[in-house]
Amino acid sequence: MSSPASTPSRRSSRRGRVTPTQSLRSEESRSSPNRRRRGEDSSTGELLPMPTSPGADLQSPPAQNALFSSPPQMHSLAIPLDFDVSSPLTYGTPSSRVEGTPRSGVRGTPVRQRPDLGSARKGLQVDLQSDGAAAEDIVPSEQSLGQKLVIWGTDVNVATCKENFQRFLQCFTDPLAKEEENVGIDITQPLYMQQLGEINITGEPFLNVNCEHIKSFSKNLYRQLISYPQEVIPTFDMAVNEIFFDRYPDSILEHQIQVRPFNALKTKSMRNLNPEDIDQLITISGMVIRTSQLIPEMQEAFFQCQVCAHTTRVEIDRGRIAEPCSCVHCHTTHSMALIHNRSFFSDKQMIKLQESPEDMPAGQTPHTIVLFAHNDLVDKVQPGDRVNVTGIYRAVPIRVNPRVSNVKSVYKTHIDVIHYRKTDAKRLHGLDEEAEQKLFSEKRVKLLKELSRKPDIYERLASALAPSIYEHEDIKKGILLQLFGGTRKDFSHTGRGKFRAEINILLCGDPGTSKSQLLQYVYNLVPRGQYTSGKGSSAVGLTAYVMKDPETRQLVLQTGALVLSDNGICCIDEFDKMNESTRSVLHEVMEQQTLSIAKAGIICQLNARTSVLAAANPIESQWNPKKTTIENIQLPHTLLSRFDLIFLMLDPQDEAYDRRLAHHLVSLYYQSEEQVEEEFLDMAVLKDYIAYAHSTIMPRLSEEASQALIEAYVNMRKIGSSRGMVSAYPRQLESLIRLAEAHAKVRFSNKVEAIDVEEAKRLHREALKQSATDPRTGIVDISILTTGMSATSRKRKEELAEALRKLILSKGKTPALKYQQLFEDIRGQSDTAITKDMFEEALRALADDDFLTVTGKTVRLL
């Protein structure tokens, strides 16, 4: 991001000047007036030719004189020792190129465009075979020294490094590449030359280079890249731009091509990073837990003298501005003022990365590290994403006081991001949306479509889901439909709002019936999944909490598990152990798919488009078939009604079932390699199948399916009305629609048909048989889940209250009755057993009607 006062063409023309004063702009005024006048003329576009590389155009005397000899007007300039014209960032481009294109500027990428590489200082190059005094002299040509000229502090020879990388680009073919993984790429041709062709077509000036490929091509080049990325990557930029613009001279890009290496084999976990990794290229993996707002970072400061109006520019070195002490034109001290709207800025974002749970040692808390993303990498990741980050590990000193320049001996570390990669081989659709479209080759898509035409594809996919868990086919089918999800519908433009597409499932039953294993399997399968436990979760841990940003010291919102699993699945184990305040936050998320926050002056509404997969155990440690679902797990009916499917996972007391289950469990311990490999292949097909359907198939209801859904809902209501009970609510109809859409996705169908509605009805009916059956009558009563009480229980409660009223009236005008005596009288009068709880409920019902009041052990009439 640059100021409005400077345009790309003006910047590029300034970079293209012939003399090596690019890093000495603050000393331009020391030269004679003729020199300044000539500099002003050059800014109008009349650029003198400069050599394009150390080995090109250096033999001609004009080029040598222009590059290595100072003009007469510059003899008075004091050239600092850390400046050398053979630095990889000082090579220019002949002025014959079109102004305004990337070729009109410096051939290597300017540091202003690569803030991720840090320092803008030019590396001093020294002669390895000369003494210290000779090293200070500017050499006439790198060719005269062969391979001996290196950047100070490294063993990087610019010409050799650039030549090796160009050979790598022009020659490398990946011998391990597979056609399925490289869609649209000829694996027999040089890989990166084909990618340059894609850059020419798409216009995206970024080349992602796999470090593993560089290592297989040249171990020395790979070592230099890992050890000295700040010096080597600009050389790579210069090499790839020369090849690209020689191959595509008419191509116009937004800026010069930037090389972004990834997959550095020096991959470490966060807790293993140590001082030896500082200023080296590393790759770490983790989960993004927070991203900051966009921060403008100054890359080049513009100063103006308040006395004589002389201006100068100063490059920013890792956030430090070298403010001029005096004006070089009028020699007035402390007269230079910073002009913000003439300075150059870049976009910057702070990202907090947390250690992945699978990389965490047992008994340890997760480590976090701060990342800084620049320019095009800003807003590329969101909280909840699992990423592999390649960047340069930095250490900066901590100031004793913000107003004092003294620093402590303790340093704080961060990573300047060069490349993100949102891939996870174990998870579904873990790539970004653009990469998803390129993930499936035509051959793979053809295979998936052939599978979708098989009549038993639904059963095949369900059996491939958690194959180690015995039976529970309907539960696996329900979870499979949850992974596919329905079609997201947005009718907000017509005033009807949004309708959720996510399916919520609750598993409840006896301990040891694989509920937690199913949750762990789903969590490891989806990319934006979160796994929490009931006792280990709080309300703010699920939603969001306010904290003070350590960088800006402002109050910011830190998101919780439900927001981090947006567009994913949130797995909640021990659902019944949650306290009431924690469960209450789920009401809005499970129906409206949003999360409203009003804390510490921060008022917002966050997206939480997540499916909830929960598991709950009964309060008596074993399921009591004589009690309803709500009585067994003690969950509020307002929450249970938001689950589309509620399954019971019971442990039947059956010897034949126990024998089959034991045989299945024992067989898991002596699987052959062929069985394991076959299971892995099934898993790969399952992941690809769901990922393709999730991203490309958006089914709509057909007329036939619409009529079938209407008939199903009306019939469900009719069955209950004949017995004076409610057997369906509009929420059940919406659940049927979502399940039918998910089943259509299983068939790769863009239209929901009657067969999908039938399967949705069957699955919904099976779940209701288990969870909404009245234990007294054995009849399905949906009001158990929606109101917390079956119609039979409600009728018995009313009858008992009426009988108690008649009993009290029959005793005459007695002002007070004993509680225990009244309880024994009503029990003796009734034909059915009456518990103390039922008696107290009847008393409360009469008290609500202002018929009586209970004080202690006495019942008084009103």
UniProtKB/Swiss-Prot annotation:
UniProt GO cellular component terms: CMG complex; MCM complex; nucleus
Nucleus among keywords: yes
Chain positions found as Phosphothreonine: 7, 19, 101, 109
Main location: nucleus
GO biological process: DNA replication; DNA replication initiation; premeiotic DNA replication
Transmembrane segments: none
Protein name stated in the entry: DNA replication licensing factor MCM4
Originating gene: Mcm4
